[in-house]
Amino acid sequence: MKALKIALTKGRLEKDAVALLEKAGIDCSSMNDKKRKLIFHSSTQPISFILVKAVDVMTYVKHGVADIGIVGKDVLMEASKSHYEMLDLEIGQCQFCLASTPDFDPSSYRRKIIATKYPAVSSKFFRAKGEDVEIIKIEGSVEIAPVLGLADAIIDIVETGSTLKENGLVIYEKMYPISARLIVNKASLKQNKTQIFQLIDQLEQAIKEEQTR
């Protein structure tokens, strides 16, 4: 049986994803002693894991290097769809928010400048509102953009809001809820349908058990 390759997002989401996979009966013990390794093989099941950056999960799945990926909905919303989105894993929950300094006026007709890591999501949001804005893409911490006068407001993902508060920002609008999703390579779903749907069934059961706690 061909081993399924699962691409996981490195960092905070990785921990939650591994915990959920283990609840679903997936052997993740090979990842206990990671050191600098990025590829792991289960010794008891035909499954391998690849640890990559969030944006690269989609790339590995798109090109068939990974059969399955676990990645935040924010990453999926920002990129073109080249995969099947199979399951909301209900981990890594946060939301897209519009935030700025307390003196920001979201109802102003003046053309606004918005700083964000997510230009596609931001453009879609303001287009739906019928607003013409200038989008500035920032790769690092966007919270300082309104404080330093680079932008009028920001759009970013927010979990607790503590980082915004620490930088003197307030939330003006909660836009879209975000959570981690299970994505599957289109060709892999055809070739490994039984294995993949068995994994999905196990994950769905683990999610249900978590909900009833």
Swiss-Prot record:
The keyword ATP-binding applies. PROSITE patterns: ATP_P_PHORIBOSYLTR. Its main location: cytoplasm. It catalyses: 1-(5-phospho-beta-D-ribosyl)-ATP + diphosphate = 5-phospho-alpha-D-ribose 1-diphosphate + ATP. One of its GO terms (cellular component) is cytoplasm. Pathway: Amino-acid biosynthesis; L-histidine biosynthesis; L-histidine from 5-phospho-alpha-D-ribose 1-diphosphate: step 1/9. Belongs to the ATP phosphoribosyltransferase family. Short subfamily. NCBIfam families: hisG. Heteromultimer composed of HisG and HisZ subunits. This is ATP phosphoribosyltransferase. The gene is hisG.
